[in-house]
Design a protein with these regions (language model features):
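A broad, low-specificity signal marking well-ordered, structured residues that form hydrophobic/aromatic
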Residues: 43-44, 62, 142
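Short acidic, S/G/P-rich loop/turn micro-motifs used as interaction or catalytic elements
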Residues: 52-53, 71-73
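A solvent-exposed, charged loop/short amphipathic helix patch at secondary-structure junctions
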Residues: 72-93
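Short, charged interaction patches at domain edges and termini
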Residues: 1-14, 53-59, 110-155
């Protein structure tokens, strides 16, 4: 198997597509994504970071964002009893998008991506976000450090 930049892109695309929550996957500058297209959501957006080229391996640092568009609930959170699930959409989005990142992390640790030679070398810290792009979105961002064999090693 080859382990270049294309393959890491295909592997992450596959992991996001296999998530139980993600509807579409985009790459590159987040501001190039048409956030008004509601059919994109829930969305996984991947930002290429650095590539540390070592003698036998390459370690890619890649930011992965999983998000959904918010439609604010009319439920008053001060009314008792209050249930987050199914009522507070922001909480639902946080729950589902974090779970999607956990699925991707599991695939890199012991699933198909690990079997294919992609190894997660960090314990990703997931950060929640709440942004107003062209639509109001929220979700989680994680930075993955993924190690692959260096395809150009010299014997």
């Amino acid at each position: 198997m080859k382990y270049g930049y294309y393959q890491i892109c295909e592997a992450l695309q596959s992991a996001a597509d296999n998530s139980s929550y993600v509807n579409s996957v985009t790459w590159g500058n987040i501001f190039d994504v048409d956030m008004r297209k509601m059919t994109l959501f829930p969305l996984c957006h991947i930002l290429t970071g650095t590539a540390e080229v070592l003698e036998r391996t390459v370690i890619y640092s890649i930011d992965v964002l999983v998000m959904d568009a918010m439609d604010y609930s009319k439920q008053d959170p001060n009314v008792i009893p209050y249930s987050f699930e199914g009522v507070a959409q922001k909480q639902d989005i946080y729950h589902r998008s974090l779970f999607s990142l956990q699925e991707m992390i599991a695939s890199l640790r012991r699933g198909d991506l690990y079997t294919d030679g992609f190894r997660l070398v960090n314990d990703p810290l997931c950060d929640p976000f709440d942004e107003d792009f062209e639509s109001t979105v929220c979700g989680w961002k994680a930075t993955f450090q993924i190690e692959t064999p260096n395809p150009t090693i010299i014997c």
